[in-house]
Amino acid sequence: MTDFVLVHGAWHGGWCWRYVADRLTAAGHRVFTPTLTGLGERSHLLTADVGLDTHITDIVNVIHWEELSDAVLVGHSYAGYVVSGAAEQIAGQLKAVALVDAFLPSVGSAMIDDTTQGLRDAIAAAPKTGIIALPGFPASALGCSGSDADWVDELCTPHPIKTYTDRITVTGGLESVPTKLFIRTAFPAANLDETVAKVTGQPGWQVATLNCGHDAMVADPDGLTVLLETLA
């Protein structure tokens, strides 16, 4: 039995891991799917002050209060920043990290560096528009279809802007985790392809692929679960 902590990306919530969590639980694992502050069922906590450090603390606190000591920490998309920041504090309590189409930060980087021009424009205009959270993308653009796309579109909520503009401090916590798996989907993104090239062949890193869209936990929960179980 392995403890898995599954961290969602921007606009989503812990709910998006439902299919994968059900499969991992059925296989005998213990699964935590926290929702980051200001999103999902915690969207009522959204303020202009919710930033990257808020979300990092969300995950550090799950590890601490659930008393996890040998966990697999999984981050999707934006959560690459959250997982990397959390690893600075709790790397010793992790047996492995999996990044699913996730952004891998460098020293002093921010999500605004990795996002689309449209979102950068919205962030730049925020002081005038007064918005504190970013609208998301349609689920169909993330590889979801049919009733799954309807479900994702219904439950996604605006994402706190400050989490995109806060710059991260990383000093090698993630690299100290013994096993690291980068899972790349078929979603077109040059910066994610660059990350694959960067980690391929590096000590402790493995790379795997899934032939599905960006929201792999919805689009291909069976395939994603199989890959995550290799870390158990």
Label the predicted regions.
Residues 2-43:
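Conserved HGGG/HGGXW glycine-rich cap/lid loop of the alpha/beta-hydrolase fold
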Residues 35, 72, 95-98:
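Residue in the alpha/beta-hydrolase core beta-strand immediately N-terminal to the catalytic nucleophile
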Residues 175-180, 202-205:
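Short, proline-enriched alpha-helix->beta-strand connector loops that line the catalytic pocket
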Residues 74-75, 79, 83:
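Gly/Ala-rich beta-loop-alpha elbow adjacent to hydrolase catalytic centers
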Residues 154-173, 186-188:
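Active-site nucleophile elbow and catalytic-triad environment of alpha/beta-hydrolase enzymes
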Residues 32, 38-71, 88-89, 114-116:
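Active-site loop/oxyanion-hole signature of alpha/beta-hydrolase fold enzymes
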Residues 88-135, 163-164, 168-169, 191-192, ...:
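Flexible "cap/lid" loop of the alpha/beta hydrolase fold
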Residues 185-218, 230-231:
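Conserved loop-alpha-helix segment in the C-terminal half of the alpha/beta-hydrolase fold
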